[in-house]
Each structure stands twice: as C-alpha cells, then as structure tokens.
C-alpha cells in the first residue's frame, strides 16, 4: 500500500531538486523497481512541458533502459508498466489486460514486446504521452500531448492504454488502429490496450478517432456509459484515470542465432551506368547507337559479361511466334500491323566480331516502294511519340536523332527499309514499356510501395476551409485507402467478392489486365457539418464522409 505513495513522494522530491538547481544527480529508488531521476539531467533546451525520466530496475539491481514521460507519471501508469514487466502471459495475465484471444489480436505481441523491452538493458527510450483533449460528439476523439521536439519522427507503433470502468466486450475501429480490434473486459481486468500504427495523428491531427461497438447485436453505448467505461475511477485520488499513449521504441534487426545452418543472401551490387567505353564494340554504328538507346531507356544495368547467348534456330522455329520471311512484302505488311516483339536471326558470318553486321540486302529482299514509305512514316510517328513521353532521360533524344539520321527519313525513297523496320519495332517495344511504367505509377494505390504494405486504411486529413459554406469543422479526418492488392488477399476485410479474387489470381499468374485491382474504401461513416446558408446556420449529418474500411476492387 505504500509503494504508489512513496513513488509520488520521490517524484515530488525530484522536482524540488530541479527547482533548487541541484549540482549533483542522485538516483531516488523506490521499492517497486522504477527509478526516478532528478529533472536536473535534462538539458536547458528542454521543451516547456514538464518531463520525467524514469529508468526501470530489473533483477539483481541492474540498470535498465529509460522511458520519458511528458508530465508526471501517475500511480496507475506506474502500476501498468509493472504489470507488463511481471506478466508471463498466462490466462490470468490475459484477463488482466482484457485480451480476447492469442491468435487474432495484434495487442498481445505488442505487450510482449513492451515487457521484453522493460526487462532488457538498452539505450533507447520509451515515450509516454498524456491525454490533452477528448471530444465525445459526434465521434469519439482522443488527442494527446505533443512529444518533445524531434523525438516523434521515429515512433511507428504505440499502445493506447485504457484504465477502464465497468463495460461490455466491444469491437473497436478507427483511423490509426491496426485493423479491427476487440476488448474483452472481465472482473479481473485492470487495463485495456489498443495497438496504434503510426501514431503521429494522435497529437498533430484531430486526434485518434475511435468507434466502439458492443459485441451484443443491436446494443449501443451512450456517452455516459462510454465515459464510465474508458475513464475508470481512481479510488485513491477520487479522480478519473485518463488514457495514456505509450510509444514503443523502433524495432531493430533481429539477431541471427549462433547455432544451426544460416542461409546468407549477398546484397546486390549497385547498378553501374554503362559509359561509352563499357559498351560492347560493334562495327555497325546503327546497332551500337540502338543498343545505347535501349539501355538508356531501360535503366542502368550491371556490367556486361562476356557470356554470349546461343540461340538454336531450329528450336526458335517451334515457338508460337514462328518465323517471318523478311523478303515477303505481305509478311512484312502483317508485321507492321502489330506491335509484337521482333527477333532477327543473322547468319554466323554476319555476326562475326569485327565484321560489319549488314542488315540490308537489296538483291535478296525486293521491297515494294509503298511498303517502304509506310515504314518511314510510322517510324517518324513512333519517334515523335517517344520524344513526348514524360520523364525520358536526357541522353535519349540525341541517340534517337542519330538513329533517325542513320535510317531513311524520306518517305518517297526505299533506302534501307530493313534497318528502318528494326528501329521501328525497337521504338514500339520501348514505347510500350515506358507506358507500362507510367501506368504502374498511376496505379500506385494498387501495387503500393515497400513502406505501404497491404491494402489498408491510412490517415488523411481534409481541409474544409476552401468550402466557404462549411463553418465547422475546418478540418477533419477523412482517411484513405492505400497499399498493395495482391494474392493471397489480406484478411483485414472479409467482405471482398469473388470477382476481385479472380482478378488477383490472374495478376499473380502474370496475365495482362486492362485495369489492375485497386485499393478503395468499402465502408463509410457520416460526419456532422455545420453550414451557413443565405438565411440561417444549420447542422447536417452528411453520409459517406469518413472511410472506415478498405478492400480491393
């Protein structure tokens, strides 16, 4: 019974030491395992909000890593940290924290991680933020105090700790939470914990928006019931216990075991830009320039090896594409009608190193003048369209101009149509690949990035001040959906349909889709807006204003 009172007394003594500008720093130790250090350890540039540095003492009186508290550490927050540190996560401990199950919750791993951190020696700090503001209507919003300057950018996960009063089992959703989470309080429950992903919105935005739905069908919580449930009574101080936001330290790389077999994968070597001296020598300036253009548009490659690819013409003839007789104008006309890739097989004599690789043979390939003019016209059109594509590297236009100079550019002259055909097919392939990159950029919501992960709800604040008719709110948390749509589909939203399942399977098999599956909102909630009309001020509940769930469509 004396532990919490002693903790408060020691904290008071530490604060008095800072006020008196003590020259020495002493550790004030209580009997429950936490060490309160004097405020004198903080530099003069500390933020104006009072800070408390707390270190955890483990078994054997060993010094542990410290945690930072914005404001003073309450006795019930102190008790929560001790309960986490001492838990062995059996059934009784799960009941203490209101954990429903061990297989479908994200809360238990986060609590275990916090407990392991409290029991280890380290230099990183744990940040504890107190509640600054709560809004009950039209939606529950919890806003917390700001962390010290420069100390919030590296926090990626947090625990929202509730010190509950009596209440039912509920399902909790909201922006910032890691999916839908459940709370299962019992008579033995002292704490309820929710996992928050990227918690910066808890202090920089409008706050954490939470929706609590009782598990009993048709039941709802009134504001009075919600207040009694989330803000438990502190019988010692005759006050309410307010929620706390505990920012977990970033997860470091997992150490490899010292025993067993270790599979190692070397880091890929950085790509090397192929300078002119790095390119394989070719006696034909056309082929050499075309190689430079292809490599400039397809990005930097690793240094070329001396390995040559041996192609068997007999095996290639059995491929579905088949072989095209370039001396047949009809076959060449069909080739121009499509944009399929073209593979030219040269004779071994023409491919000899140091010998010019001539692609034209006027005596063996009598082209019709009309077909040659068509090749020249389409070549100029493809080159013009390629120049207009956004984001081309600066080396591409000069190389393209040189290639056109090496090809017949007069539509009235047959010239060397085989060389022009080769350039035309190359430009068609490069144009299609560059368009595909642009399309993948536009479909970024579907494919996502390395930091986005799977399709999930993300925080998005919308500014309504541009809508002059809307008075309140000026900004609100509308949320958005972002992330990868891939097979197997994430089970965060079980209401996806068979149509998107088939699309995702086709995408996984590499099938071409006109539209990739996209991460979009699948459920919304309304928002209360106060607007100004010509006659009066009115309040309207506008539907579909806040995205609450995401899925692939």
From Swiss-Prot:
The cross-references to SUPFAM superfamilies, in alphabetical order and at most eight, read: Cystine-knot cytokines (SSF57501)
Q: What post-translational modification does the entry describe?
A: Preproprotein is proteolytically processed to generate N- and C-terminal cleavage products that homodimerize and associate to form a biologically active non-covalent complex. Binding of the non-covalent complex to AMHR2 induces dissociation of the pro-region from the mature C-terminal dimer. The N-terminal portion of the protein, despite having no intrinsic activity, has the role of amplifying the activity of the C-terminus.
Residues annotated as glycosylated are: 325, 409
Q: Which PROSITE patterns match?
A: TGF_BETA_1, TGF_BETA_2
Gene that produces this protein = Amh
* Reported function: Plays an important role in several reproductive functions. Induces Muellerian duct regression during male fetal sexual differentiation and plays a role in Leydig cell differentiation and function. In female acts as a negative regulator of the primordial to primary follicle transition and decreases FSH sensitivity of growing follicles. AMH signals by binding to a specific type-II receptor, AMHR2, that heterodimerizes with type-I receptors (ACVR1 and BMPR1A), and recruiting SMAD proteins that are translocated to the nucleus to regulate target gene expression.
Could you confirm whether the keyword DNA-binding appears in this record? no
InterPro entries named in the record: AMH_N, Cystine-knot_cytokine, Muellerian-inhibiting_factor, TGF-b_C, TGFb_CS
Q: Which Gene3D superfamilies match?
A: Cystine-knot cytokines (2.10.90.10)
Q: What's this protein's name?
A: Muellerian-inhibiting factor
- Where are the disulfide bridges? 455-519, 481-550, 485-552
Return the annotated site residues (Cleavage).
Answer: 445-446
Task: Supply one GO molecular-function term.
Answer: transforming growth factor beta receptor binding
Q: GO annotations under biological process?
A: anti-Mullerian hormone receptor signaling pathway; gonadal mesoderm development; Leydig cell differentiation; Mullerian duct regression; negative regulation of ovarian follicle development; ovarian follicle development; positive regulation of gene expression; positive regulation of SMAD protein signal transduction
């Amino acid at each position: 019974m004396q532990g919490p009172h002693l903790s408060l007394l020691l904290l008071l003594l530490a604060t008095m030491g800072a006020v008196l500008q003590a020259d020495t720093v002493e550790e004030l130790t209580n009997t429950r395992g936490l060490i309160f250090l004097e405020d004198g350890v903080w530099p003069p540039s500390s933020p104006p909000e009072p800070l408390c540095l707390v270190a955890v003492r483990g078994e054997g009186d060993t010094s542990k890593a410290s945690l930072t508290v914005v404001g003073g550490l309450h006795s019930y927050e102190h008790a929560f940290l001790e309960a986490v540190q001492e838990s062995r996560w059996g059934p009784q401990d799960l009941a203490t924290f209101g954990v429903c199950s061990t297989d479908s919750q994200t809360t238990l791993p986060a609590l275990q991680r916090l407990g392991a951190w409290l029991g280890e020696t380290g230099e990183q700090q744990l940040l504890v933020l107190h509640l600054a503001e709560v809004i009950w209507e039209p939606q529950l919003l919890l806003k917390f105090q700001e962390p010290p300057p420069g100390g919030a950018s590296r926090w990626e996960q947090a625990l929202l700790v509730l010190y509950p009063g009596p209440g039912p089992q509920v399902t909790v959703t909201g922006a910032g939470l890691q999916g839908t989470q459940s709370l299962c309080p019992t008579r033995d429950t002292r704490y309820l914990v929710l996992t928050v992903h990227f918690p910066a919105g808890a202090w920089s935005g409008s706050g954490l928006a939470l929706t609590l739905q009782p598990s009993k069908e048709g039941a709802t919580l009134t504001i009075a019931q919600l207040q009694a449930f989330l803000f438990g009574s502190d019988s010692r101080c005759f006050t309410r216990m307010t929620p706390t936001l505990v920012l977990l330290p970033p997860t470091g790389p997992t150490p490899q075991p010292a025993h067993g077999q270790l599979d190692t994968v070397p880091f890929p070597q950085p790509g090397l830009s192929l300078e002119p001296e790095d390119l394989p020598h070719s006696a034909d300036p056309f082929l050499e320039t075309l190689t430079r253009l292809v490599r400039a548009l397809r990005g930097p490659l690793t240094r070329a090896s001396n390995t040559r690819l041996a192609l068997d013409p007999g095996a290639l003839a059995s491929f579905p594409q088949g072989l095209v007789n370039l001396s047949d104008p009809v076959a060449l006309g069909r080739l121009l009608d499509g944009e399929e890739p073209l593979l030219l097989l040269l004779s071994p004599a023409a491919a000899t190193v140091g010998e010019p690789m001539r692609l034209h043979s006027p005596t063996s390939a009598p082209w019709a003048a009309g077909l040659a003019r068509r090749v020249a016209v389409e070549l100029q059109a493809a080159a013009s369209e390629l120049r207009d594509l956004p984001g081309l590297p600066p080396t591409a236009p000069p190389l393209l101009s040189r290639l056109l100079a090496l090809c017949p550019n007069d539509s009235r002259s047959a010239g060397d149509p085989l060389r022009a055909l080769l350039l035309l097919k190359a430009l068609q392939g490069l144009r299609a690949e560059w368009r595909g990159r642009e399309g993948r950029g536009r479909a970024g919501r579907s494919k996502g990035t390395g930091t986005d992960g799977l399709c999930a709800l993300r925080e998005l604040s919308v500014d309504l001040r541009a809508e002059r008719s809307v008075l309140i709110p000026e900004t609100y948390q509308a949320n958005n959906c972002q992330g990868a749509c891939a097979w197997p589909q994430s089970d965060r939203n079980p209401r996806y349909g068979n149509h998107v399942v088939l699309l995702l399977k086709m995408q996984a098999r590499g099938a071409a889709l006109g539209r990739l599956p996209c991460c979009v909102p699948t459920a919304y909630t309304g928002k209360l807006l106060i607007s100004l009309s010509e006659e009066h001020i009115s309040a309207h509940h506008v539907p579909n204003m806040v995205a609450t769930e995401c899925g692939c469509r």
